[in-house]
Structures are given as structure tokens and as C-alpha cells.
Amino acid sequence: MKTLLLTLVVVTIVCLDLGYTLKCNKLVPLFYKTCPAGKNLCYKMFMVSNKMVPVKRGCIDVCPKNSALVKYVCCNTDRCN
């Protein structure tokens, strides 16, 4: 009985995500990835000339500054990019 209880506890810990992990969309929003530790922002990168089509999406630790050619949009909730 103790073994069964211990097994259930271990399975619960493995199945539940005890630490917070962020999920960010990949280039195609149907797919996402779980961000590694330390990367706590999702980002979407656009070319300034065409803001409708994102060039890149993913996980990042610090939101980069926008430039004359590239614009970044960062957020910190699951699949927000």
C-alpha cells in the first residue's frame, strides 16, 4: 500500500509542472515550445516595412530594442506571441 501511494505521488509530481514554465509560439503559431530556465519572455520580431508578417517568434531573456529595420514585441504569458 505504501508503495502504491509513493508511486502515485511520484507520478503526480512528474505530470504536474511544479515550476513555472513559459510556452511561446514558434514561427507558425500552431506550434509552441517550452522556454528553458532564464528565458522568461516570448517575442515576435517584425520587419518595420511589413508589420503584418512576423519573421521570428520564440523565447528570450531580455526584450531587444527596436531598430530602424526591425521591431520586437515581447510579452510574458503563455503563447502570447
Swiss-Prot record:
One GO term of the biological process aspect: killing of cells of another organism
A molecular-function term among this protein's GO annotations:
toxin activity
The record ties this protein, via CDD domains, to: TFP_snake_toxin
Tell me where on the tree of life, at the top rank, the source sits.
Eukaryota
| Keyword check for Manganese | no
Which interval of the chain is the signal sequence?
A: 1-21
Q: Which GO terms describe its cellular component?
A: extracellular region; membrane; other organism cell membrane
Q: What is its main location?
A: secreted
What does the UniProt keyword field contain?
Answer: Cardiotoxin, Cytolysis, Disulfide bond, Membrane, Secreted, Signal, Target cell membrane, Target membrane, Toxin
| InterPro entries the record matches | Cytotoxin_Cobra, Snake_3FTx, Snake_toxin-like_sf, Snake_toxin_con_site, Toxin_cobra-type
Disulfide bridge positions per record: 24-42, 35-59, 63-74, 75-80
Q: Where in the cell is it found?
A: Secreted; Target cell membrane
The record's tissue-specificity note reads: Expressed by the venom gland.
Alphabetized Pfam families for the sequence: Toxin_cobra-type
Task: Give a short account of what the protein does.
Answer: Shows cytolytic activity on many different cells by forming pore in lipid membranes. In vivo, increases heart rate or kills the animal by cardiac arrest. In addition, it binds to heparin with high affinity, interacts with Kv channel-interacting protein 1 (KCNIP1) in a calcium-independent manner, and binds to integrin alpha-V/beta-3 (ITGAV/ITGB3) with moderate affinity.
**Could you say which protein family the record assigns here?**
Belongs to the three-finger toxin family. Short-chain subfamily. Type IA cytotoxin sub-subfamily.
Subunit organization: Monomer in solution; Homodimer and oligomer in the presence of negatively charged lipids forming a pore with a size ranging between 20 and 30 Angstroms.
Q: Under what name is this protein listed?
A: Cytotoxin 5
Recorded source organism is Naja atra
